[in-house]
Amino acid sequence: MLQDFEICPVRHTSLIHDLYIDLRAIDTLEVNIANQNFSNYGKNDFVRDICSDDYENHIVIENDVPIAVYGISKKPINGMYCIYFLGNKILDTNLKLQKEFLKRSNAIIKEWLSTHECLFNFIHKKNNRSKRWLTSLGAVIHSDITHNGMELFTLRKGDANV
């Protein structure tokens, strides 16, 4: 059964390190593109970012294995709140975990939209699985607003299917 915790740096650092090593390939690509201005971005930088005070960050664990991290910015950027979900490569092959995490993710999005008007982030143009999930929730992929192979997506409260 998946357990969800608000990230506590002292308690979860080693699990976040482990997740960095086992990220889905597409999530690794997105993290690297988002941080390409930092030439030596690595595991310690990832942990620092995931533990940042700028976001409400959570870690999802099953049997002491990090399955995912996710979060939402505490302050809006141009009226929108930045969100992220990053998963362990085990989600690519384990259907049971996949279904459970999707169900949980949908509930998280619903919760965020109850208090935030608009959510956003950039997603890699080849991240088809996540793009399908986002569009099923009512997100709009703005393929005309791109940066380094990443496309903007927005999810507005009134358009959501959660």
Regions found by a protein language model. Give the residues of each.
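Active-site rim helix/loop that mediates acceptor-substrate recognition in acyltransferases
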Residues: N35-Y55
